[in-house]
Amino acid sequence: MRRIGAFGGSTALWALLAAHVAGAFEPVSVGIAIGAVSALTGYLSYTDFYCRFTECCHEERPLNTSALKLDLEEKLFGQHLATEVILKALTGFRNNKNSKKPLTLSLHGWAGTGKNFISQIVAENLYPKGLKSNFVHLFVSTLHFPHEQKIKVYQDQLQKWIRGNVSACGSSVFIFDEMDKLHPGIIDAIKPFLDYYEQVDGISYRRAIFIFLSNAGGDLITKTALDFWRAGRKREEIQLKDLEPVLSVGVFNNKHSGLWHSGLIDKNLIDYFIPFLPLEYKHVKMCVRAEMRARGAAVDEDVVTSVADEMTFFPKDEKIYSDKGCKTVQSRLDFH
């Protein structure tokens, strides 16, 4: 309130001074000049002033690539493919002012491997409020689309929600969690918004971002990771080309993927299928350390080892990968 009062006072003072100065010149000319300057100043400063007090949609604000890269490298563990592809995809999309379609990413892997976490990182790098932003929209299948008999209702509601929010902010972000629990057919309602149209009913969707999160394909990803491990090869040697084709076909043919026989895949509207590899023992320890730092506690390696040792690993013989990733690290750390 003090800032607004100060602003009002300074405006009144400026008007008073302008009136005194105007008295020394020809009234009409000075009046026009003052009016023009006032209009220009108001036009240039109003938006910045307004956005100090409320969240604004900055569609053309450049992405801080260095900050995103640092966040991905320091906060996401064991996911070299996801880090590389997300950074490349977001940077390229935001730097391209003439994108032909919205950016559409499909993230796949077992629970606890970092899919939700990376969507949070992306949201925070696009909008300071992250997932709490008015321009970031999170849908959870079991919460927002629970009933199979209401598919048509959900499709209509989804279209209206996306249409309304993109018309308000062209660079809105839409995140769909638990795609593997989404009833097939619902997601096809947004197909027109993801296609190569300049506009749909007068609205352009070309600056929007759509992110799908799914456990579907986790078995295919794990098989590839295991094959590399058993061949004595490092997981960092796994490339996107080793997994993306298998993922897209596997998800398309999986009745429990939410993208089963979806036009989004059939029409190649998903830009990247991003695999999240199963996490190893060393990655779980990294998660524990990160959680301890986030809580403001000193890292105790005995506690780190103790928490990691409590996790269960698979396959039965090799015991390489955590079956819950880092998902239960927070709750387990509470008991130490």
UniProtKB/Swiss-Prot annotation:
Keywords (A to Z) from UniProt: ATP-binding, Chaperone, Endoplasmic reticulum, Glycoprotein, Hydrolase, Membrane, Nucleotide-binding, Nucleus, Signal
GO CC annotation: cytoplasm; endoplasmic reticulum; endoplasmic reticulum lumen; nuclear envelope; nuclear membrane
InterPro entries: AAA+_ATPase, P-loop_NTPase, TOR1A_C, Torsin, Torsin_1/2
SUPFAM superfamilies (UniProt xref): P-loop containing nucleoside triphosphate hydrolases (SSF52540)
Residues annotated for ATP binding in this entry: 109-116
Location in the cell: Endoplasmic reticulum lumen; Nucleus membrane
Tissue-specificity statement: Highly expressed in liver and muscle; lower expression levels are observed in brain (at protein level).
Keyword match Metal-binding: no
Function per UniProt: May serve as a molecular chaperone assisting in the proper folding of secreted and/or membrane proteins. Plays a role in non-neural cells nuclear envelope and endoplasmic reticulum integrity. May have a redundant function with TOR1A in non-neural tissues.
Protein name listed in UniProt: Torsin-1B
